[in-house]
């Protein structure tokens, strides 16, 4: 995991990031936890062009450790970045805090689906800065 706090677009952003074990296309995919003072909290996968495929609103299937797969709401950003947002961010982060690994099914535009594996066991919630109270 890599943790960072930096100024960004009219606020401060705190991120926790880890790369997938596998390459997808030209590079590995990042799993990003982000808290921004203006935008709030979000969780997303960030890849490379041509980007990850998902309907405007979709369901993302994932498996934490050896548990049964679960499906969470997902979406693509309207700005066109090669990303998929996990809309149920609190639920996802709560699962990561208890897990050693997560396998997430994704589709790259124009290709069959694949599974990305992330070794999330070293996640340190104390290094992912909370948002200030409004």
What are these regions (language model features)?
Residues 1-134:
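A generic "folded-domain core" signal
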């Amino acid at each position: 995991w890599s943790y960072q706090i930096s100024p960004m677009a009219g606020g401060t952003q705190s991120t926790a990031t880890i790369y997938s074990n596998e390459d997808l296309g030209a590079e590995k995919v990042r799993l990003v936890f982000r808290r921004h003072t203006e935008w709030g909290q979000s969780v997303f996968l960030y890849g490379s062009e041509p980007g990850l495929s998902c309907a405007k609103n979709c369901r993302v299937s994932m498996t934490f450790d050896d548990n049964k797969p679960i499906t969470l709401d997902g979406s693509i950003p309207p700005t066109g970045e090669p990303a998929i947002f996990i809309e149920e961010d609190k639920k996802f982060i709560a699962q990561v805090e208890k897990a050693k690994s997560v396998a997430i099914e994704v589709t790259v535009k124009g290709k069959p689906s694949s599974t990305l594996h992330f070794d999330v066991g070293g996640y340190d919630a104390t290094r992912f800065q909370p948002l200030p109270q409004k």
